[in-house]
């Protein structure tokens, strides 16, 4: 079964980050295979509707698929969610970050290397979003997730692919480590000492989740 796309259909849509987007005319996409199994495009639309998804936030490589999904919502008589297409992260040489080749593309790598979750969240926020602006007009790069979410504005997200600057992450991590209370710092340090064989009896990183 194919989705018949009318030649005169309106294919522009509003992206929360990029504003009005003019997408290329899609082909008559297969939405149901011969064996009755739905393809991704039909499955994701129905699944998002059934789960009550209000915002679809995904990488910019999916922009060309959005008109297909919006047409399916319309044909099925469903209310579409809002769409936001994030810029793709880049290495320092501006090449695309590979999930297979770059260890930093895996969250577990940051845990194993000793990066604090608070520092990583702060760093990721800064990749596509400007620093916090204080009442005196100054910028502040160190902020909590609560502060970030309270001030978040889609219109401020940078649509240009940001550079994954490890030096900035290392600096932020140092800031957060120095702010830890002694007890908290010790609790976070013990698993690394255990894994290194320096101490015995301390919980491992895996046991701490």
Predicted feature descriptions by range:
Residues 78-209:
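Catalytic adenosine-cofactor/nucleotide-binding cores of aminoacyl-tRNA synthetases and other
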Residues 1-99, 106:
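Active-site cores that bind ATP or allylic diphosphates and position pyrophosphate for catalysis
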């Amino acid at each position: 079964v194919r989705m018949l796309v009318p030649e005169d259909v309106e294919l522009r849509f509003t992206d929360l980050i990029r504003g009005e987007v003019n997408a290329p005319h899609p082909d008559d996409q297969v939405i149901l295979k011969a064996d009755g199994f739905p393809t991704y495009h039909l499955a994701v639309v129905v699944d998002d509707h059934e789960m009550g998804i209000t915002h679809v936030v995904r990488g910019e490589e999916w922009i060309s698929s959005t008109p297909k999904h919006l047409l399916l919502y319309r044909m099925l008589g469903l209310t579409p969610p809002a769409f936001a297409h994030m810029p793709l992260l880049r290495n320092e040489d501006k090449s695309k970050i590979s999930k297979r080749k770059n260890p930093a593309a895996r969250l577990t790598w940051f845990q194993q290397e000793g990066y604090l979750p608070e520092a990583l969240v702060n760093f990721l926020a800064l990749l596509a979003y400007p620093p916090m602006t204080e009442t005196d007009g100054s910028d502040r790069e160190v902020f909590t997730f609560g502060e970030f979410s309270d001030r978040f504005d889609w219109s401020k997200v940078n649509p240009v692919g940001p550079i994954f600057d490890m030096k900035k992450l290392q600096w932020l991590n140092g800031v957060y480590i120095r702010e830890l209370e002694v007890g908290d710092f010790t609790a976070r340090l013990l698993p690394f000492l255990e894994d290194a064989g320096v101490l015995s009896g301390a919980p491992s990183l895996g046991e701490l989740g």
